[in-house]
């Protein structure tokens, strides 16, 4: 053997070994993923789906990564490249704008979360945001302080305008001047010019004109102005001692409208004047309509309202606006002279004393009747003195059985009723005012092209509708050229919103539903045609299990040429000619056959006017029994779209949104799974050659997530074939059984592939946290039988859980249930019907269907009767008509059968399910000495809004399940409760530390 070679080999081995050893000693070991704890949720960062924005040229994408609590950042990166920049955005993300040429980016940077929290403790402290403007080719960033509203100048993309936020003056009043500085910046060189006291501004679509309104102290210089960006000339359009508001450009940018409001001390509201401005070959003719100068046609006692934005008709012949009643200011009666009033009162007292002394001395008074006659005879003549003007009135409400709307509903709607206004128009070519809407037609929609309007009057049916929930209305057609109205349909029935009229884009026809069929009404000819009766498909939504008659499936949309409507049956999409003569086509063809639902169309152009059948259309698809999702494409044909959809994406994930760049064939779609956060991918028109753009959830590798999901098939006790999603716990080992929480709310198995971001929900529930912490989560579907909403849950959930147990995943002795609102009701009811579950957490549950029926849904002010009879309650009448059903399905009347420990969340200001529902069940269980804890958060509504409350309950609910399902030690609040005097100390020990 060559000794030298051996020595070299040994030396090399020694050096290599030492190097590896040194590297091993200095390298940081990879962190082992752990279950996520609630205190780690606050710092969890993720992409906000609504923030994802494509540049018009398709070159750039911007998106925000925000924490649950704290400060976030904006990521700006190349769509097909790794080039990117990250910018801080503070504690709030306001959105982002690209210039139309894709060269510039602008966004607001909010204050830091620490500053926001500190300011919250200092009443009156004003915080200011910054505007950041970025040149994408160089990453040069320019910052502007005190940023308010901002916008690039449309197609020209040469300037950006920024409204600077005013500093609030001490003692500022709501009526003070609202104008502030407006800054206009030339993007290419950063040069700027400004105007003071600007309250509103807006560019036209081209971006060559900037309209702005001035609102100055003392109304000095108030008016409407127009700035030509190229010539830098300002044109004064109108000025007056008035306030100007509601600036509104037409979509084309060839005209705009606004309101001029003048104070009149005799009335509570300002008097309005509508102003219209046209853009015509370098000139800007102004059209003004002042109702005070038109006593002949404008209704007396009314004015143009400031509560509706005016706008031009498409042909620029008319201005549309709202009018409302003027409410006079009540004159205060002069207060009586205090000296004279005192003297008068002394005189009355003296006269009364003398009269009573005389009566007392009268020996002829023997009986009560004698006394009453003497008192009446001796009453002083003449009027009583006027009551002082500051007499205190009672604070009360009168509830009358003849009220069409409950007083509670009237209270909720009070401001809307006060500000109610009627659509009217002014023809600038004839100088004619026309009131389009009257007091009979309280609801009105002006249709496209402003030729017609549809109005509804439900006054004859409103009383009954508030009781039984069945919706009827009288439908009127209004000709906007003449102002004449025609009753089209009397007592038109809306089993659901899908039966309501939907107009064509040329404004001459509308689609509506009746008796399970779709019809087209032609307004110029006043004719109607049934367009679905001859088709080999039903458009009745047979899966709608509410107490309504023949609800329809949904409209996909009108075609842009107004010749077709695209309508879904339960599976496929049909292209149906509106003339009722030509042949309808099943575009998707295989939906029913393959149990694929073609759910709807992706609208890729937000400014489109109808579905362009000359372009490919992208359709969302979903596998009813596989839970797959994807995107299919329909191609243009000789007549409309070509039958037969091409599947572009079809996978075991949730394919969510699809977007397209405004000016490029660049598409972006989202994809997620139950254990994989939502990511966005750039692709082409065929959805091939995809590139992942986002990198969501930067900290996801630190934590353990669900190990998988299983689809559980089962049959309800009533023979319905149903499914449930069984999410495996993190670290799942086959053959091992796990504690499980069952969650439900009607049908949710379609969420099998949906990612649930860690967070503090308003109900305390987050399945991602539960699976991360070793729970299996099972989400079964529930379908309903009329008059048995509680028993329906029993018939579905119990067989579902039994089927899930057969998978071998679930420990049958460690199952809990949870639901909120209607799901809370199902939880409360299930706890009365079975001992299968070892713990139950019910959020805001309905517990007494008899008393709940007659209570108020305080958030809307309406009664619960309509909800019970035509909506979620699924009863066919009131309790007196269906007594056994109400008792049979009420947790409170079955409370003696409860064996499951119960945690109830119910808040004292719950405006959906009255707080008394939780109290009733709690007290009944307590009376029966059954384990129950009710958690109440003061001032909270149906769900928890305050972050500190959401944090607190999220932890408590998991502690509850940990104790009963995992055998963890019981916290003191669960074991023995907390006395009132110790509550503050208890809460202090549990409070989350504020995030740095």
Predicted regions located by residue number:
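Hydrophobic/aromatic beta-strand patches that form the interior of the parallel beta-sheet core
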Residues: 434, 454, 529, 681, ...
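Glycine-rich His-Gly loop
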Residues: 458, 622-623, 672, 743-747, ...
